[in-house]
Each structure stands twice: as structure tokens, then as C-alpha cells.
């Protein structure tokens, strides 16, 4: 049974790629057709690769892997944070700070500073400090939480990194590759897939598409850690047991949506 049905992918708009003039030719094999100047992703391949990504993430989690979710654009930020937290993992959903992985020692010092400021507030230190100094500390904490809050409790460099839009997150992907960290990613038609270990061909610009894929990978982590029974199965999910919609039906939907 496919972990994501063709129907779910269609409803979330996962099939819409970028304008044809913005494509990366290396994504050609994942593209089904072109309609009205927009590339249409082959969802039969997305179904297959989503299954592979699910299995990869589940198996990694079963071996106690630390997973870092990365998605800093506005369409991804909320889903990345919510699903990372739901699956007990870590996230970066604002600007990626260069050296987050390759200069982990320095990042740990900044995280330690964040924790120190929090302790100062909790133990009453703020109450005896001048208001001006407290204001500066709060400003520093807010900034540190914005960029590092999602990895504040990450015990080590991640074993796996999941990325929404590796075209935008090129620095993060390069750091992961330098350290030998496998990358699972939603890859749109404008992206070079060469540095991605586990590819999910998908529209990475639609909020619903990002939420669907990201939530399913979070489910994989939960299953890997807690077993299949821990994953909540949606009522319509059983429909994915049936034969996937045909390519012709996909074209009809796409033509209708782009009319």
C-alpha cells in the first residue's frame, strides 16, 4: 500500500512544477508533461519515491537517528516546525546560519548562551539587573530562539537531514554532504537533484503539498520509534490501496486546474 495516494497528491497540488523556462534539465525524468508553460510532475513517480523516502526515514528512526528538518521559506516554516516537534525531532525554519553543521562547536556555544539567558530569567537574576540590561538580554534571547530554538536540544550533529526546497537551502545541503549526512528532500522541477540522496519529486511551493509530504515523513519517524500502531491513519488513507489514478486522469485534472 502506498503511503501517499495519487488522490492526496493531486488534491495538495503536488504535481505542479515551475515554469518551463525555469526548469533544471536534470529533473527531466521526473516530469510527465508541460501544460500552459508549467511543468507537470509525474505523480506515479512521486508515489514510488515517497514510499522509498518513508522507508528510509522509518528505518533511520528505528536506529535512533537524529533528524533535522530544514525549510526556511514561508510556505514551509510552519509545517517543518510542527512536524519536527510532533515526531520528536529538530528543525530550522528561519534563515540557515552558515556553519550550523560544519562549525557545530560554535553553534553549540550560541545555544549555551541561549540556555544561560533562560536560566537567568528563571532563577530571578533578571529581577536584580538594570532594566536596560534585561532588555538587551531579552533581545538577544529572541534572536537566538528565532535561529536556534529548533535545535536547542539537538544532542549531536544530525544523522539525517530532511529539506524542503534544496534549491533555496543549498548551503544546508552542501554542509550535510561535506559531513556525509544523507539528505531526504522535496525536489521541484527547478532544482539540481544530484546532491540529494533520497528524492521526492514534488511541488515545494504550495503549503498543502509541503504539509502533506512533511507530515508523512514525520509519521515514518514515529513508526520507526514507536511502531506502526503509533501512526494515526486517516480515514481516506485506505483508498490508497486501490490502483492509482491513471496518467490520463492526471492530465485531465491538470488541464482543468490550468484552464
Curated annotation (Swiss-Prot):
GO cellular component: cytosolic small ribosomal subunit
Entry annotated with the keyword Ribonucleoprotein: yes
MF terms in GO: structural constituent of ribosome
Domain of life (superkingdom): Bacteria
Gene3D superfamilies: Glucose-6-phosphate isomerase like protein, domain 1 (3.40.50.10490), Helix hairpin bin (1.10.287.610)
UniProt xrefs under NCBIfam families: rpsB_bact
PANTHER family: 30S RIBOSOMAL PROTEIN S2 PROKARYOTIC AND ORGANELLAR (PTHR12534), SMALL RIBOSOMAL SUBUNIT PROTEIN US2M (PTHR12534:SF0)
Protein's name in the database: Small ribosomal subunit protein uS2
Organism: Streptococcus pneumoniae (strain CGSP14)
Amino acid at each position: 500500500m502506498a503511503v501517499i495516494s495519487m488522490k492526496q497528491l493531486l488534491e495538495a497540488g503536488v504535481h505542479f512544477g515551475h515554469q518551463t523556462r525555469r526548469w533544471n534539465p536534470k529533473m527531466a525524468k521526473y516530469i510527465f508533461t508541460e501544460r500552459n508553460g508549467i511543468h507537470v510532475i509525474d505523480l506515479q513517480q512521486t508515489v514510488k519515491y515517497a514510499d522509498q523516502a518513508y522507508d528510509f526515514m522509518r528505518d533511520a528512526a528505528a536506529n535512533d537517528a537524529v533528524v533535522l528538518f530544514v525549510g526556511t521559506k514561508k510556505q514551509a516554516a510552519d509545517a517543518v516546525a510542527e512536524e519536527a516537534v510532533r515526531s520528536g525531532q529538530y528543525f530550522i525554519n528561519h534563515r540557515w546560519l552558515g556553519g550550523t553543521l560544519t562549525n557545530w562547536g560554535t553553534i553549540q556555544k550560541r545555544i549555551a548562551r541561549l540556555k544561560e539567558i533562560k536560566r537567568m530569567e528563571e532563577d530571578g537574576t533578571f529581577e536584580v539587573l538594570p532594566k536596560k540590561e534585561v532588555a538587551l538580554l531579552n533581545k538577544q534571547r529572541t534572536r537566538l530562539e528565532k535561529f536556534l530554538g529548533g535545535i536547542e536540544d539537538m544532542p549531536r550533529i544530525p544523522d539525517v537531514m530532511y529539506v524542503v526546497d534544496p534549491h533555496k537551502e543549498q548551503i544546508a545541503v552542501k554542509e550535510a554532504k561535506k559531513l556525509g549526512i544523507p539528505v531526504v528532500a522535496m525536489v521541484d522541477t527547478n532544482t539540481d537533484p544530484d546532491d540529494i540522496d533520497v528524492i521526492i519529486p514534488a511541488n515545494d511551493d504550495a503549503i498543502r503539498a509541503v504539509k502533506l509530504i512533511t507530515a508523512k515523513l514525520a509519521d515514518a519517524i514515529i513508526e520507526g520509534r514507536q511502531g506502526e500502531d503509533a501512526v494515526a491513519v486517516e480515514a481516506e488513507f485506505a483508498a490508497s490501496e486501490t490502483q492509482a489514478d491513471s496518467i490520463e486522469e492526471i492530465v485531465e485534472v491538470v488541464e482543468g486546474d490550468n484552464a
